[in-house]
Amino acid sequence: MKIIQIHNKYRYFGGEDSVVDEEAKLLSSNNHEVNQLIRDNSEELISFQDKFNAFKNISYSFRSVEILNKELLKFGNPDIVHVHNTFPLWTYSVFDFFKKKNIPIIMTLHNYRLIWEKLGLFNKDREKYGYFKDSNIGSFIISKFINKQKNLLKNVSKFITHTEFTKYEFSKHVIPENKLVIKPNFLNSTNNKIQSISEKNNAIFASRISKEKGILTLIKAFTKIDINLDALGDGPLFKKVKKYNINNIKLHGNLPRDKVNKFINKSKFLVFPSEWYESFPMTILEAFREGTLVLASNIGSIKSIIKDRFNGILFEPGNTSDLIDKVKWILNNQRECDQIALNANNEFNQKYSSEVNYKQLIDV
């Protein structure tokens, strides 16, 4: 089968970018011909005029249509198109383009951009997060453009969501339920030895260094906890956090995925303190695979992935005191935590391996 992947990379490499790459490898390894059409924000957003042009074309990009025409001349018409992220450079013009050619389209809903306004993503102080470059004004303008483009979604045959929670939210607000299917993210299995928490040392945070990811709540908590924290990742608050110079928190910046996995494997537990809705965090999946305990905020689809004290530990998002209490519980109940981590690893093998996911993807 010939497949075209459409994706717009993010400024900070994250889970969505990783999923796109791994999915392409999975399909190719099963003898499918995959053509990745990847655009990057660095293409255009350099000068003021470039930024203005990108903003002007945000609802329909003639540049994207030009690229697609050239690629089809080289690659030929695919059997199916799999769209991931179209924002901001591809735009929804890709749906119109392939629909006119009668080529089926599926789209993975990696985030809640289509329904941000409906969900009202707030932090613990009831301040609405600026989901576009941390700007409420920019977010408002972008949401209006997105609303204008929603009629193009009728050109999509199927939408992939990652959990029951995400399927419910999208069906409630914008997409008919019969167009939604659930397919979680996946990772390749490893033969890494699962160690007891008592044999490991530090805690780990591996995500974007930004307020919606809960980094400030995490820092407040770990200044009052006697355990070291390795913080992996980059983001808008990286320099600010670095200036705090907290003794038991070490910032490592962005690292290659293999090094991230090594950190996760040797850590007592992974902290995932996000304070807004996630879809299906890859770092949680990596911890499941490595047999490392997950301590995560009880919000959004995380509640669909983690069953408290069965395959992970949940705490109230943005609640420093609750986070501290849960860390102390982990440190004082390591034998029980070993069983929780083992349950998570068993669940990974049953639900989230590449072998299981390939069948789910083809069934879509």
Where are these regions (language model features)?
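Membrane-proximal helix-turn-helix segments that form the acceptor-binding/catalytic region
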Residues: K100, R113, D125-F159, Y168
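Carbohydrate-associated surface elements
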Residues: F165, F186
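Conserved donor-binding/catalytic core segment of Leloir-type glycosyltransferases
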Residues: Q195-K213, I219-T223, D230
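Nucleotide-activated donor-binding/catalytic signature segment of Leloir-type glycosyltransferases, i.e.
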Residues: K239-N261
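Short acidic/histidine- and often glycine-rich active-site loop of Leloir-type glycosyltransferases
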Residues: I284, I299-R309, I313-L314
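Short hydrophobic beta-strand element within catalytic cores of glycosyltransferases
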Residues: L293-A296
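Conserved acidic donor-binding segment of nucleotide-sugar-dependent glycosyltransferases
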Residues: D308-R309, I313-T320, W329-Q334
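A short, well-ordered alpha-helix in the C-terminal region of glycosyltransferases
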Residues: D322, W329, E336-K351, N357-D363
